[in-house]
A protein has these predicted regions:
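Short, well-ordered beta-strand elements
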Residues: 39-48, 102-105, 133-136, 190-191, ...
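Gly/Pro-rich hinge or "lid" segments in bacterial periplasmic/extracellular proteins
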Residues: 79-80, 161-189, 193-277, 283-286, ...
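Aromatic- and charge-enriched surface segment that lines or borders ligand/interaction sites
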Residues: 92-152, 191, 278, 287-290, ...
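Append "and occasionally in soluble cytosolic enzymes with long acidic Gly/Pro-rich linkers
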Residues: 249-250, 260, 349-446, 450, ...
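Long beta-strand-rich cores associated with HINT superfamily self-processing modules
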Residues: 557-583
Length: 583
């Protein structure tokens, strides 16, 4: 998925190339043959990913795929609303000490890694242990790996930040270095000691970043790890034709009861899926036509052009789709789309008046109209449904005259760059080449054109786009943050300086005052004080404008006629294990 901007932590270690080569050849052969998957098979369109290494699962597509193959200590409860956590590789929720600092997990005794030569020969396997969990969390902290998921642990686990600092040196990372906050008390007992009570810490342990990996397999593959090797999850990767198709099949020998959930009424008599197939398909219209032909069992991200064919005037499903047996579920999604300024950029990053001018040039009403009501206007970083969201308008909302005045204050009267005598020229990076992205980007360019700014549009594939963003090469870029869990700090951590690229603070905002507010909020146990801190952080970023707040998507999902036991979920990690197909 994400390119790794820093050297791999394993590139200086000898690697067991025979094992790595065998895995590569197996997947290549399977992908080339494109054998028919076992039925019933769930099929969907998805975006391409570069790796199944869960340490780099920072997109929804990569997270969904990694969650099929690997297990975490905890998982999101499929049924519960409001959302809550449930045990997964752990046999129960952790025991928590009275001071809230020690968490003790007991691993299930039936969590087994898939076969791999690294375990001692062809077909060899073994049980997952607490030591594997310790290794996996240390790996996430390794500075050489440069995982975008480090934020779930940063500043929280006793001794882990010191481990990360030591791993930044030129010598190979010592994974046997003691970390007081990570202890395998025996094969099945893991103790984590926090530096302070962290109300949101457990949510992070349900994300693919925190997947439990077998050390010997990771070290055998070295920099080639990421082909779905030796996971313990409900599916295994059977074939992968990069950029085209991924096929996952149910893991042999896994107890089906582990993945069973109370069934919805529509699931009576329906059969669990034996396989999951992801087909890479970037163009929205092609995805839609494929769904109508029955190629896919589910359709998401309905395009503007297809919206009127999906939703009737009263907001219900269009009658012709209902007649086909298609069903619709819809609700606001837990995500925020934003146009970011790279705060390291010498033009936009150093000039608050310029950023505010661009924010005032953004016409939210026209953006919502372009998207035919699929988008709700954004006034800050928190989406609807997240506690503490400021509902009032942004201090730099749409006002073209104010935008022009701010441009003059920024040193660009009339939009003219005094250094060139011509219009100020900026560049917006975009992570897709499809028609919908182009139309949206051209509309944004027209907003800036109105106030005198020339905006160039740079399109690339999503992996290429992320590489540029992670390397801080993009001046401005359009991106969506999908909440990892329903807590305001999950969105507000996108502005913490220690989370700068390649971490989730992709705009590289750095403010000591903001960092102090966030640190206090992360420790706060008094709800009123925490709410005040959440409000103060929103007020700061709304004023500083490291982002233009673009919108929040209304999640609309169409279910194929045979898909059963589906619940709309903001965190659908591994959800396919719960789904069924009707006869």
């Amino acid at each position: 998925m994400n390119a790794r901007p820093a050297p791999s932590p394993y590139e200086r270690r000898p690697r067991r190339l025979r094992a790595a080569g065998a895995a590569l050849l197996l997947l290549a052969a399977a992908g080339a043959g494109a054998a028919a998957p076992p039925e019933p098979c769930f099929r969907r369109a998805d975006r391409t990913i570069a790796s199944l290494d869960p340490a780099f699962a920072s997109t929804m597509a990569a997270g969904r795929a990694a969650a099929l193959v690997y297990e975490t200590l905890l998982q999101f409860d499929y049924e519960a609303r409001p959302y809550r956590l449930a045990p997964y590789a752990a046999e129960a929720m952790p025991e928590v000490s009275e001071d809230g600092l020690e968490l003790t997990f007991r691993l299930r005794d039936d969590v087994r890694f898939g076969p791999d030569e690294a375990f001692g020969g062809p077909g060899a396997t073994r049980r997952a242990t607490a030591a594997d969990a310790v290794f996996s969390l240390k790996r996430l902290a390794d500075a050489k790996l440069s995982s975008p998921g480090w934020w779930i642990l940063a500043g929280k686990v006793e001794g882990l930040d010191a481990f990360r600092e030591a791993s930044a040196g030129p010598e190979p990372t010592d994974y046997d270095r003691d970390v007081p906050g990570l202890r395998a008390l025996d094969d099945r007992t893991l103790r984590i000691r926090l530096v302070r009570p962290c109300p949101d810490f457990l949510w992070g342990l349900a994300l693919p970043y925190a997947s439990i990996l077998p050390r010997e397999v990771v070290e055998a593959r070295g920099e080639d790890f990421g082909l779905g090797e030796a996971g313990s999850g409900p599916f295994r990767l059977a074939s992968w034709r990069r950029g085209h198709r991924m096929l996952f099949v149910r893991r042999e020998g896994r107890d089906p009861a582990r993945d069973r959930t109370p069934e919805l009424p529509d699931a009576v008599g329906a059969e669990p899926y034996r396989a999951v197939e992801y087909l890479a398909m970037g163009d929205a219209s092609t995805r839609w036509l494929s769904f109508l032909r029955g190629t896919f069992d589910l359709a998401t991200e309905i395009s503007r052009d297809d919206w009127d064919a999906v939703v009737a005037a009263d907001g219900s499903l269009a009658p012709d789709l209902a007649a086909r047996g298609v069903r619709m579920v819809a609700e606001p999604s837990l995500e925020t789309t934003y146009m970011a300024f790279n705060m390291d950029d010498p033009v936009v990053g150093t000039n608050a008046a310029l950023r505010r001018a661009i924010s005032c040039a953004f016409d939210s009403a026209q953006w919502v109209a372009l998207n035919r009501g699929r988008i709700l206007p954004a006034t800050g970083p928190l989406p609807p449904g997240v506690d503490g969201r400021i509902e009032g308008p942004s201090p730099w909302s749409f006002d073209p005259e104010r935008a022009r005045a701010l441009l003059a204050e920024a040193g660009y009267p009339g939009g003219i760059d005094p250094a060139t005598g011509r219009r100020l020229a900026l560049t917006l990076d975009l992570g897709s080449t499809d028609q919908e992205m182009r139309e949206g980007a051209e509309l944004i360019a027209s907003f800036l054109d109105r106030v005198g700014i020339s905006l160039s549009l740079s399109y690339s594939t999503f992996p290429q786009f992320l590489r540029r963003v992670n390397r801080r090469e993009a001046q401005m870029f359009l991106l969506t943050w999908v909440g990892d869990y329903p807590d305001p700090l999950n969105f507000l951590q996108l502005f913490v300086s220690s989370n700068a690229s390649p971490g989730p603070n992709r705009c590289n905002y750095a403010s000591p005052s903001y960092d102090a507010l966030f640190e206090e909020a992360a420790r706060a146990t008094d709800p009123a004080r925490r709410a005040a801190l959440v409000r103060a952080m929103q007020e700061e970023v709304r004023d500083a404008c490291p982002w233009v707040f673009v919108g929040h998507r209304r999640e609309v999902v169409l279910l194929g006629p045979r898909l059963r036991n589906y619940r709309l979920h903001d965190f659908p990690l591994g959800a396919e294990k719960h789904w069924r197909r009707a006869p």
